[in-house]
Amino acid sequence: MQDFSEPGSGKADGEGSAVPSPAVVAQQAVQELVLPQPVIRMNPDEKHAQLVRVPTWMWLDRGMWQPVSRTVSVPGVSVTATAIPRAAAWAMGDGKTVVCAGPGTPYAVKYAADSASPDCGHTYLRSSARQSGEAYTVLVSVTWDVEWHGGGQQGAVPGLVTRAQVPLRVAEAQALVVS
């Protein structure tokens, strides 16, 4: 149990019951936030081999790219913490990192097969054949900004992070020109 008898804890001198400060209640609200895990989507699909020098599209399910809030109320104080996804950093497994400001654009057949994603993509220059399992490990880290307000106060909590990863095989294909 939290000891609110410390200075600045929200307990007034001589009071018989502790009233936590809004910042303390905010910590609890942040701890109780349930952030969705990223669901990685790619084109070509991560179940199939990607080709060297062909653009890879990456995106996250749009349903997870939404604000998440949690309100915690204790006698005398109610605080709401809201987490908003800010960026997705994709470690592509080949030493490159791609930072996307949003969830990315889902690939659709209306796009040319060799077109690059308008906002979240990567082009591999080497095969993954020499990697463990002959695949790169693609790791996405979504950073969430958290703001809270309540009890006449407000504040921010530095980025929370959720992560997901998938293996991605990248193959080389060679064309044979026959005349």
Label each PLM-derived region with a short phrase.
Residues M1-S179:
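Extracellular/lumenal mature domains of secreted and surface-exposed proteins
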